[in-house]
Amino acid sequence: GGPFIAYLATSRQIFQDIYDAGDMFAIYFAMGSISAGAASLLNARLVMRHGMRRLSFIAMTTLTLISALLWGWTEFVGHPGFILFMVWQTSFIFCIGMIFGNVQSLAMEPLGHVAGLAAAIFGAVSTLVSLPLSWLVSGYFDNSIAPLVAGFAIAGAMSLALMRWARRA
């Protein structure tokens, strides 16, 4: 969640300062956001056939890989063009749409008898973890998308490691 909050915090600067989007910011932002709705609809169709764990793992792996690739691009090739950024934005938001609902449901699965309390605790803990990560990623914003995509790649890799650990536990 931390890099996603950092994206929300820096998106206006990215679109207006880096890509000179001007008044089109809201439209470009919305274009990327539509993919979260598409992910929810697709998830509803696939979850019974493939399961929450598998869909979450595939989405997290995809999010991590596309972010690592774009991070590498920014470091070795230079600033990506607007179209490439939009493809990444739409893709990572789609992945987030697949991940959040499934992971929250998986976390709540064994706690059905105290679901309300568990939801409140999970919400508080995820906020307490996300905000410092968001602050860290946002703090490195330097009129480049590199810190943001690096944050997604690193947090994604850490999340994949935690998913593997949780599966074995």
Walk through the language-model features, giving the residues of each.
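Residue-level signature of mid-helix packing/kink "hotspots" within the transmembrane helices
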Residues: S33-L41, L131
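C-terminal transmembrane helical hairpin of 12-TM major facilitator-type secondary transporters
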Residues: R54-V103
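Extracytoplasmic gate region of multi-pass secondary transporters
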Residues: G1-F29, S35
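A late C-terminal transmembrane helix in Major Facilitator Superfamily
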Residues: Q104-D142, G151-F152
